[in-house]
Swiss-Prot record:
Chain positions covered by the region annotation Disordered: 62-82
Function: This protein may encode a site-specific integrase, which is necessary for integration of the phage by site-specific recombination into a tRNA gene of the host chromosome. Essential for virus infection.
A biological process term (GO) from this entry: DNA integration
Top-level taxon in the UniProt lineage: Viruses
Family of the protein in this entry: Belongs to the 'phage' integrase family.
Keywords noted in UniProt: DNA integration, DNA recombination, DNA-binding, Hydrolase, Transferase, Viral genome integration, Virus entry into host cell
Entry-linked InterPro entries: CB (IPR044068), DNA_brk_join_enz (IPR011010), Integrase-like_cat_sf (IPR013762), Integrase_catalytic (IPR002104), Integrase_SSV1_C (IPR031857), ORF_D-335 (IPR012922)
Gene source species: Sulfolobus spindle-shape virus 1
Protein name from the UniProt record: Integrase
Core-binding (CB) domain span: 97-189
Keyword Transferase: yes
Active site per UniProt: 211, 281, 314 (o-(3'-phospho-dna)-tyrosine intermediate)
SUPFAM superfamilies per UniProt: DNA breaking-rejoining enzymes (SSF56349)
Length: 335
């Protein structure tokens, strides 16, 4: 092997270093002349080799554009196999940016800008720190990592768009389970016997239909709660990704409660016959629909991003939602 400061020679292959990244070239001999043919980023070549060795793709060498450009697809072929190879090349190139500094900044971005939970953020960091797999966590993580890098001008928007087009999040199997009123009542009683604080969380979940993370957030500053005419609402205005709650509607006035999501998880672990708190949300949506609350209003109350209503008109639904919520509040009085 011969080398200089930025060039390493291994037989007929050259490895060049550029800005901390490595690129592979192959020496080719033609009419007595030696030419260097660009093969691709080292990470692409290694990952493609491993994929081919495992039988994931065929045996055609990966082709890519010269350094400074995003990986090309001239040697990728067509059809499903070509699409898979392009994805491998794109993901391999993206992984080169998973440096310690970028990973730390990405974690801060997930927690502070995207509002993602600590556990989920750590799962995403774990996903981009390992070779890409076709799992929902990895798919979401790589897409978010591409968005993050583009937002910091570390990669071009065009490259981020290629990642978003190539890496799709596979749909999860639909969970159609909706608990019965009897199951809800039983869980509330179990929660009350377990802890008054845990019971309070479950009660607000039943009244509001919002997520556990949102309930815990409003209980940090309960003094912002507004009550009147048998209905209370909390101006939360918390959005992240596809989730966004403007107001938390409920009946029981809020109070400061020292409880964490781990306490809820512990309760659910200890009481296998209790309904998980996430299903309270589904029960609320189902009951509101039974009470003829419009679907758009249910979405607004439960903090789903609008699909049937334009975003600019979404926040104006507050007055309508407040009146419609009274139907559910009346029903709750008998529970």
């Amino acid at each position: 092997m011969t080398k200089d400061k930025t060039r390493y020679k291994y037989g007929d292959y050259i490895l060049r270093e550029r800005k901390g990244r490595y690129y592979v070239y192959k020496l080719e001999y033609e009419n007595g002349e030696v030419k260097e043919r660009y093969v691709g980023p080292l990470a692409d070549v290694v990952e493609s080799y491993l994929k081919m060795k495992l039988g994931v793709v065929g045996d055609t060498p990966l082709q890519a554009d010269p350094p400074g450009f995003e990986p090309g697809t001239s040697g990728s072929g067509g059809g499903k196999e070509g699409t898979e190879r392009r994805k491998i090349a794109l993901v391999a190139n993206l992984r080169q940016y998973a440096t310690d500094g970028n990973i730390k900044a990405f974690y801060d971005y997930l927690m502070n800008e995207r509002g993602i939970s600590e556990k989920t953020a750590k799962d995403y960091i774990n996903a981009i720190s390992k070779p890409y797999k076709e799992t929902r966590d990895a798919q979401k993580a790589y897409r978010l990592f591409a968005r993050f890098l583009a937002s910091r001008n570390i990669i071009h928007d065009e490259f981020a768009d290629k990642i978003l087009k190539a890496v799709k999040v596979k749909k999860a199997n639909a969970d159609i389970y909706i608990p019965t009123l009897e199951e809800i009542k039983r869980t509330l009683q179990l929660a009350k016997d377990y802890s008054e604080n845990v019971y309070f969380i479950y009660r607000i979940a039943l009244e509001s239909g919002v997520r556990l993370s949102e309930i815990l957030k409003v209980l940090k500053e309960p003094e912002r709660d507004i009550c009147g005419n048998d209905v209370c609402y909390y101006p939360l205005s918390w959005t992240r990704g596809y989730k966004g709650v403007f107001y938390v509607f409920h009946i029981t006035p809020l109070k400061r409660v020292e409880v964490t999501k781990w306490a809820i998880a512990d309760f659910e672990r200890r009481h296998k016959d209790a309904i998980a708190i996430k299903y309270f949300r589904k029960f609320v949506a189902s009951k509101m629909a039974e009470l003829s609350v419009p679907l758009d209003i249910i979405d607004f109350i439960q903090g789903r991003k609008p699909t049937r209503v334009l975003t600019q008109h979404y926040v104006s639904l507050f007055g309508i939602a407040k009146e419609q919520y009274k139907k559910y509040a009346e029903w709750l009085k008998g529970v």
